[in-house]
Amino acid sequence: ALTHYGPLAVEVTTVLEGIQNKVKPGTEVLFTKGCDLVDANWPESELIRYPLTSEEQSEIDKAVENAKKSDVAVVVLGGSNRTCGENKSRSSLELPGRQLDLLQAVVATGKPVVLVLINGRPISINWADKYVPAILEAWYPGSQGGTAIADTLFGDYNPGGRLTVTFPKTVGQIPFNFPTKPNAQVDGGRNKGLDGNMSRVNGPLYPFGYGLSYTTFEYSDISIQPAIVTQVQPVTVRCKVTNTGKRAGDEVVQLYVRDILSSVTTYEKNLVGFDRIHLNPGETKELTFTIEPRDLQLLNSDNHWVVEPGDFKVMVGASSEDIRLNDRCTVVEYGKEQAATSATSRQQKSVIASSSQESAPLVLDGNLSTAWKANKGEYITFALENNASPN
């Protein structure tokens, strides 16, 4: 839980100790190692399946016996700085060594199982995802990680973390990163089955931004202002989130955008904002995000960062693949946004432009960030003073 990047002479609370400190007096906590982190043939065992040795089978049998005697089994698996770190590329993303054998044997007892992962990289836990009812990703939780994990397992803490990486299902999907470009993670096939042309399983095991909670959340009332902007104007996005469960909890609300039609291929979704909020049961909060012009930029064929006119899809969700709300905004070329507003609402005023905001505290439209197009086509921000003589 500590790795070799920090001081080692610190007091450590293991997961076992955290659970022992949490249970009520008189509760028996059974423990056995179950298996080593890696087996004797590792890393070759990531390519070749070796039979279990008698010693390995004996350790797994002890874990099975303990599980049969217990109300719930907590299986702690993962990796360490031996399997993850600088210059530690692996041939597989599966659980190393005999860890999956141990997990499968404990699950086969029929007792409730909780899997706790302590690891430094995504692991392809496809079998566990299908057959284990509860999985807690702890990463490297630090010296007091055992206490934090026990608090979470016993419900004294409601987890609210979200993945900053993508968990692939297999190494065959790599590179599998977020964001991705259209059709980057599919093979183009439409027909499944033996006679179809689907050659692989698509989609991540767990997508970017994914994470669960002991409560539930509902999203509603998305609004975008203004819906029509120039290439230099920000956009304000508002939405509401309600805790619809019975527990207080944190939700990480994520804002994504997509350029619907562009001159070059762009990402399916770009994360442009997020906010972690705490909500009590039944509580609703309104969130406000700002999409800046730089959030809509692309690198065009001339290697220039530009905001191209057109429609942008705005998405709010609980992960990159759990989108709850959709809307869109439209970017128009500078000057053409007037077609969407009433020309009679504009007043003629004479102004002077200055490159210093401090020299012109009063601005024509009340916005110090108003941008005007320069003669060479670039955008320069000026401060504009009301009622000044033309200069």
What residues fall within each predicted segment?
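Intrinsically disordered, low-complexity Pro/Gly/Ser/Thr-rich segments with frequent PxxP/GP/PP motifs
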Residues: 263-299
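Disordered, acidic Ser/Thr/Pro-rich linker "stalks" and the adjacent N-terminal cap
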Residues: 335-389
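Terminal connector regions
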Residues: 292-335
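Secreted, periplasmic, or luminal enzymes acting at the cell surface/secretory milieu
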Residues: 1-16, 20-26, 30-34, 38-51, ...
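Extracellular/periplasmic ectodomains of large secreted or surface enzymes and adhesion receptors
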Residues: 21, 27-68, 180, 184, ...
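Short structured motifs
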Residues: 220-226, 270-276, 366-367, 378-380
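Hydrophobic helix-and-loop "lid/oligomerization" segment in the mid-to-C-terminal part
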Residues: 32-131
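Short acidic, flexible loop segments centered on an aromatic residue
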Residues: 246-263, 269-271
